[in-house]
């Protein structure tokens, strides 16, 4: 940005009010020289170390920007930032821009007033003129924190065009924080200045990405604004080089337990809350009709099928009419075949007993609709039988009322769709048979099924095909519309029952589940992409990926005591919900390779983008868009002093049930793996791995109910690695206990797979814990190189989970 001294020049005068510009005695002002159509000045704001007026209050900060013109000496409110909630160090995304036509000079003074907003409904941007140095009157719903002011020239001439100003109270005495003003730099590139532009931009972009996408730190896990973000998510990679053995790569992802830390665990976690919610719904049936989660899911499935199949049937019916108008027998037969297939699927979708029972429940729930006994079928309808010829269904109330309701009415309405289709088939057969004898032989089979329908259709000339099929198609559509109308109302009634009991409680549970799932999903996507890239040229892995799917194993170190019970309950549900996730690999069409998540709560698809060169190396099934499934399992063993209390005086049944349930899931995955993978691959796989024995050993350890049986985790991790799975290790913060477990796992791999001598095992273990990425992870989170353990705690830890002397002490956790 160039600063230019001007007197009475044209460029300077257009910034002055007209009355002042005509005064020859007017003083000179320095205008800001900018390219036309560019803003004269842009800057961004950030506050640091703000002092709250009330102790322990979380600030909701807003900055009001006002301008003091050098000529008029009046204070004009110009704009304001957005509100940044819950922090003493807000960074505002809304900058301040002065357009090219705005009268601003180096001598122009800008005043920044910081407020704590208590009621957002009163926060509006206003423009008004006040005498200089007069503070605006206090706004309703906000309290004054402090102010600072500067001249535009001071900002532009400062080092790096950055000012750090002290915020002071209205009397100018007490300092209540700092506000930073930074110019947004948009300069021009001259010859010779662009040599390193690519390197600089990439470096800045990487720095921004690292800063903005960094995982939530341990100290922030209780903040509401970060509750959907995984805690301390990191990739731990060990690459082993050996002169005698093949090089190997081992990845473990470490992350804090996916849980609703902000909401807390006073009433337990999701597993307990969901069970209690279902029990209360079941036992409060007088307020609503109870439907199990399975029935609710079935209702959603049927509604989804309806929405997909109805337009398909209508489309194929129109295609049939189009073929009839063209008098094309082959096209007519093909269109009829497609119509028949889609209509049969449509009819099959309503065979479930849930639709019938929902119709009855909806009728009974209506005022005055208490069903005492089913009405006689004879009095239920006076319409002609659809067996003679499907009539055009007359529009009526989709669910008949008290006096004329018939439980068998649904069967008749539903069956009319099939009968209408049979009439269409019979008519098409008759038309084709009359058009050519040989072409009709294949359709006589259908005619034998419904001889009365075929024989009852009179002969018609060839040119009347469209006119003869049109009424039958219209009847089919009307019958379908009647079925869809009734089914949608009844199944929607089923879904509404889910919310009939304690709607706020249901919404809070849904929110909690979404929070936990979001954290788990972020880690899963990270793990999947890393595993895909490291195994991209492994044909066995790629075949397993699209044939069977991937096992995703979570190792939990949470205790079954106090708040960590709730964390474990949240974590168990969140990881189980990952079964709803499928992956789809697509070719990247641009440099944007960030994954994209689509779908709803019942089913998510994550699209992973690969560059063209990498995408071409994939098997055909994956390139064609086949969905790739994951099988998440969780094994948890508490290892700290709280687990000692739980084992001696509390309850460990939660941990036992989780381990048993997930062992069964792991066993089921192994069974599918052995059935679906090719025999030659299986024979080679079995020579290298004895998974059956490992699974039996794992089952025995789960059944043994041994205290702090960490062998469960060792066996589960080994099985996961041998099945080409993705590994996660979790504790409350993924910082202390997780560090002990991951380093132990790495040393065990070196010993078992890469011939690390047993005499060096402990030395290598201590070295990994004293130096390297684990202690750096601790430093990054709490600014201290100390694991948050004390001597008494470590006495309760299993032997190999204790850090070396000098690496632990009093620290944040």
From Swiss-Prot:
Catalyzes the hydrolysis of the 4-position phosphate of phosphatidylinositol 3,4-bisphosphate, inositol 1,3,4-trisphosphate and inositol 3,4-bisphosphate. Plays a role in the late stages of macropinocytosis by dephosphorylating phosphatidylinositol 3,4-bisphosphate in membrane ruffles. The lipid phosphatase activity is critical for tumor suppressor function. Antagonizes the PI3K-AKT/PKB signaling pathway by dephosphorylating phosphoinositides and thereby modulating cell cycle progression and cell survival. It is an enzyme of class 3 (hydrolase). Strongly inhibited by inositol hexakisphosphate. Residues 1-13, 394-404 have a biased composition (Basic and acidic residues). The keyword Hydrolase applies. Coiled coil: none annotated. Residues 23-165 form the C2 domain. Its EC number is 3.1.3.66. InterPro entries: C2_dom, C2_domain_sf, INPP4. The keyword Lipid metabolism applies. Residues 378-391 have a biased composition (Low complexity). GO terms for cellular component: cytoplasm. Pathway: Signal transduction; phosphatidylinositol signaling pathway. It comes from the Eukaryota. The lineage of its organism: Eukaryota, Metazoa, Chordata, Craniata, Vertebrata. It comes from Macaca fascicularis. This is Type II inositol 3,4-bisphosphate 4-phosphatase. Belongs to the inositol 3,4-bisphosphate 4-phosphatase family. GO terms for molecular function: inositol-1,3,4-trisphosphate 4-phosphatase activity; inositol-3,4-bisphosphate 4-phosphatase activity; phosphatidylinositol-3,4-bisphosphate 4-phosphatase activity. Residues 1-24, 370-405, 435-460 are annotated as: Disordered. It catalyses: a 1,2-diacyl-sn-glycero-3-phospho-(1D-myo-inositol-3,4-bisphosphate) + H2O = a 1,2-diacyl-sn-glycero-3-phospho-(1D-myo-inositol-3-phosphate) + phosphate; 1D-myo-inositol 1,3,4-trisphosphate + H2O = 1D-myo-inositol 1,3-bisphosphate + phosphate; 1D-myo-inositol 3,4-bisphosphate + H2O = 1D-myo-inositol 3-phosphate + phosphate. Keywords: Hydrolase, Lipid metabolism.
